[in-house]
């Protein structure tokens, strides 16, 4: 089915208000969920909203909590999210990293006791729109087996790197081949994954999203490489925030809350003039996209450029929402 941005935001806002969230906070949170969905990231927008409300109802998310600064060390700050709403707090933390970068050339905010930030790419994009390089990542509950194991002991720990090119170039990737949100998107659409995304119950690689969702044997990106990246990202976020590791979040909490996150902004224009920056970025992009195609019908993609197209299409044609997901939201 198709809905407008306004219908989507109103549906989110209604549910949040019904849970006692104050009107200003509800409006800002609903706006972020709707913008994420409008950008084409359904897995962490409309599809994720019922799960967000479940955690709100369970008390994992504290809607009136405010993040608190703990430590300042020049360009580095440490904050405690105090289990506030994840996407609103993450936006605030990247804003703060940008402010620090304006003063120091680089800004880093380490956040502990945070909730799921929904679409991590929103915060990298936020920095790139203002002309900064944006880098951020989060740890999570253990939902992926380390390479060589059957049990989930590491997080998908998504990493975002956004570059202020025209259009914005951005990598937004979990350390698994697919996020669990993308497994759900493909399952709801009745599609197999385009490449192997995990193991079946017999230990064979599979493209069946429903099988992987059920047995939780999701495949690390690049096999042992994604496994290793997940581990070191967790270690850095834990140390810089003085927060909880994947092990602590998984073993000590009843659900995925109290995670640790990193937000970095770099002011490129302190190191290179704008015209030179743009020319260098354009040459990189042109060199890549003019390579001989393996398939004449498939353009060579640059990471994140599809979001500009998806946003324009959704604004023109309306936002596609799965019927079953919309029914869940209407029932909340």
From Swiss-Prot:
Catalytic residues of the enzyme: 44 (proton donor)
The entry's keywords: Cytoplasm, NAD, Oxidoreductase
Coiled coil: none
Localization per Swiss-Prot or TrEMBL: Cytoplasm
GO molecular function term, any single one: NAD+ binding
Keyword Cytoplasm assigned: yes
InterPro entries according to UniProt: Diketo_gul_Rdtase, Mal/L-sulf/L-lact_DH-like_ah, Mal/L-sulf/L-lact_DH-like_NADP, Mal/L-sulfo/L-lacto_DH-like_sf, Malate/L-lactate_DH-like
One Pfam family linked to the record: Ldh_2
Gene Ontology cellular-component terms listed: cytoplasm
Reaction(s) catalysed (UniProt annotation): 3-dehydro-L-gulonate + NAD(+) = 2,3-dioxo-L-gulonate + NADH + H(+); 3-dehydro-L-gulonate + NADP(+) = 2,3-dioxo-L-gulonate + NADPH + H(+)
SUPFAM superfamilies listed in its UniProt record: L-sulfolactate dehydrogenase-like
UniProt: NAD(+) binding residues: 168-174, 224-225, 304-306
Entry superkingdom: Bacteria
Enzyme Commission code(s) on record: 1.1.1.130
UniProt main location, coarse: cytoplasm
PANTHER family: 2,3-DIKETO-L-GULONATE REDUCTASE, OXIDOREDUCTASE-RELATED
Record note on quaternary structure: Homodimer.
Sequence similarity: Belongs to the LDH2/MDH2 oxidoreductase family. DlgD subfamily.
Protein task: Catalyzes the reduction of 2,3-diketo-L-gulonate in the presence of NADH, to form 3-keto-L-gulonate.
Protein name per Swiss-Prot or TrEMBL: 2,3-diketo-L-gulonate reductase
Organismal lineage: Bacteria, Pseudomonadati, Pseudomonadota, Gammaproteobacteria, Enterobacterales
